[in-house]
Amino acid sequence: HTDSSAASDVYKRQDPLYSPTRVLTENFLKDFNIKTTFYNPHDLKTLEKSITKKTKLIFVENPGSNSFDFQDLKKIVSIAKKNKILTTIDNTWGTPYFLKPIKLGFDMSIVSATKYYSGHSDVMGGSLAVNKKVFSKVKAAERITGLRLGPDDAYLITRGLRTLDVRLDRHSENAKKVAKFLSKFKNIKLLYPYKKGSYNFKMWKKYYSGASGLMGLKIKCKNINSVRKFVNSLKLFGYGYSWGGFESLALHQEYRETGTRKFLKLAKDEHLVRLHIGLEDPSDLIADIKQALKHLK
């Protein structure tokens, strides 16, 4: 979660954070005299303590990018309202189908339309939902900056939205079956709301009506080449970053920076692999993962 504000404003955000968002806040916003500070998503006291009179916005990513940490959303909204601070959430993972942030009290909710809204990996775009309090300011900014989708992109996203519920139900159903299979392996820590009793599961269950298809795997393996072979030997999974389409994807996040590994709580011999579970037959996906796991030594 992030808290950022300019010379007179600070912007609060969580850590870890989606890397392009991190670059935006750390490298781009500072040129506009906007300062960004971080808080621990599992310890919201760090958020409360870091708020100052200059804090203008709290930015939430739920779940956290690659960490898959879920937060207590109502508590964040409560902290923000108490201090008269605006709140924004990145709701790309859940989409409004599984989570409705504005109803929870958030001022703004952003979703990457490139992903589940489109559903076919053929569009680049985004959406912003806001409450009545900030609508006029956001609308004015939109007119000034010229944020308009092209007609073709708008058409393709509208097409995708017509099947959003059907697709997300299938993504969720498939991901749950894959998660159940992967949970049996002692050398794999599943980053997905599957393990009952965990803090992340409780926070997911408290606010979401379902789970989408993106998950992370913390794989304990001394040989990084074995992890690479595991990913490269998957036959039904494409290799790519932009998830949310109909197809399954795998990505080996080869983090080498000490800071990033610390943020993601990656041990020395742990490696992060991200899977997006698509709309294929779940038994085929599980069989594919099973044959690829033989490369982990």
Q: What residue spans do the PLM features occupy?
A:
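Single conserved hydrophobic/aromatic residue that forms the stacking wall/gate
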Residues: 1-7
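PLP-dependent aminotransferase-like
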Residues: 8-60, 78, 82
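Buried hydrophobic positions in well-ordered alpha/beta secondary-structure cores of metabolic enzymes
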Residues: 11, 58-61, 76, 90, ...
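PLP-dependent enzyme catalytic core of the Aspartate aminotransferase-like
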Residues: 19, 26, 35-37, 49, ...
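Active-site core of PLP-dependent enzymes with the aminotransferase class I/II
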Residues: 63-86, 94-100
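Active-site PLP attachment segment
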Residues: 102, 106-164
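Structural signature of PLP-dependent enzymes
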Residues: 159-181, 208-212
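Conserved C-terminal alpha-helix-loop-beta "cap" of PLP-dependent enzymes
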Residues: 190-273, 277
